[in-house]
């Protein structure tokens, strides 16, 4: 086995999930992530955790949804056995790495929507654990990224096997700015959007549950906007439910999407926005800071962390960003959309420029704006 797989497992178990002896650990393993699953199982055992490994293959998932569509039954009641498993878990690790990235593309849209809504209690139970999502490099993901398997493996491990403590220190500077700020203004040639972040808490996403960070790799700072107004364009693509979204533009009033368009995937975008009442509102503003991610791969776990990008999510807001007692935006979806900030862009907080053309004031690449 590639030694980097064992290193990946060690970072996941020790730095990210912080597994202790006696922890009940559920590991969900995609069909292409078997090797990482083996390495993680060994690491959990070495640390005294109690393991339950669950196969998470796209093929059976697709067949199940197709069967439910044919049976004309609803998803009103959450699956009690899955709920019980998650309620008993201390840690939930999701190891992605499917062999077909579009496996559920032909599932009827209304079935996908109903399934998402029906999973609400299960999703809440999973989010109540120390959960972490990561990905094992597979041939299908390499192909989706337009890379050879060897190049994609290097890309994944460059993003995962980082000096997380040093990156956490750098990102803490941005967290401090957002925590004390009131209004974020995003400006590009096609975007003019203002977001209220008053009384919000930004998350320094260090790839560790100790910092309310649940992705490996990570490397972003994110918060939950209280309000948003303006127009935003997303020039970086992503795939949702097997459909590619490109050239997305949203017009937002009082944090409600009132108009939308897309060069590709507009029907799927509309379907997502209609999932439930919260799906047409913004739940997240995220700023990528992981320089180990140097290209778009059409895998959101990596793409949203890429340095010199900004992303906004329609749907669910994360509780870690909200004041005590505030429910925030609820939804069955959380779909991130990405914008490239490397050229002709400016990000300000309360009128102060905190990022220009992708660079922060503490970086050498940051330059003063030319005089008019």
Label the model's feature ranges.
Residues 1-229, 370:
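Active-site bordering "gate/hinge" segments
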Residues 32, 98-100, 138, 200, ...:
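Short, glycine-/Ser/Thr-/acidic-enriched flexible segments
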Residues 186, 251, 347:
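Short aromatic-centered micro-motifs
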Residues 259-323:
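Dual-mode signal for accessory low-complexity, basic/Gly-rich regions
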């Amino acid at each position: 086995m590639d030694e980097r797989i064992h290193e990946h497992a060690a970072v996941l178990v020790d730095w990210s999930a912080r597994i202790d002896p006696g922890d009940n650990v559920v590991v969900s393993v995609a069909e292409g992530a078997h090797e990482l699953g083996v390495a993680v199982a060994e690491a959990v055992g070495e640390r005294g955790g109690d393991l339950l490994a669950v196969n998470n293959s796209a093929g059976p998932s697709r067949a199940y949804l197709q069967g439910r569509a044919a049976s004309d039954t609803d998803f009103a009641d959450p699956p009690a056995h899955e709920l019980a498993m998650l309620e008993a878990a201390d840690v939930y690790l999701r190891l992605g790495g499917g062999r077909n990235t579009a496996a559920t593309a032909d599932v009827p849209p209304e079935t996908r929507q109903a399934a998402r809504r029906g999973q609400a209690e299960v999703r809440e139970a999973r989010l109540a654990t120390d959960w972490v999502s990561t990905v094992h490099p597979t041939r299908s993901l390499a192909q989706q990224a337009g890379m050879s398997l060897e190049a994609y493996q290097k890309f994944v491990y460059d993003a995962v096997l980082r000096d997380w403590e040093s990156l956490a220190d750098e990102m803490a500077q941005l967290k401090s700015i957002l925590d004390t700020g009131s209004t974020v203004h995003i400006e590009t040639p096609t975007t003019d959007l203002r977001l209220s972040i008053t009384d919000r808490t930004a998350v320094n996403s260090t790839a560790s549950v100790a910092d309310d960070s649940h992705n490996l790799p990570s490397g972003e700072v994110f918060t939950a906007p209280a309000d948003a107004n303006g127009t935003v364009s997303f020039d970086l693509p992503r795939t949702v439910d097997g459909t590619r979204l490109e050239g997305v533009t949203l017009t937002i009033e009082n944090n409600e999407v009132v108009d939308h368009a897309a060069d590709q995937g507009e029907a799927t975008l509309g379907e997502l926005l209609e999932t439930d009442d919260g799906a047409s509102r913004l739940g997240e503003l995220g700023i990528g800071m992981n320089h180990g991610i140097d290209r778009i791969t059409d895998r959101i776990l990596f793409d949203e962390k890429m340095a010199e990008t900004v992303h906004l999510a329609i749907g669910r807001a994360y509780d870690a960003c909200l004041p005590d007692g505030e429910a925030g935006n609820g939804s069955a979806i959380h779909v991130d959309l990405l914008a490239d900030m490397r050229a002709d862009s400016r990000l300000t907080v309360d009128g102060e420029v905190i990022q220009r053309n992708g660079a922060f004031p503490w970086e050498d690449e940051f330059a003063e704006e030319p005089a008019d």
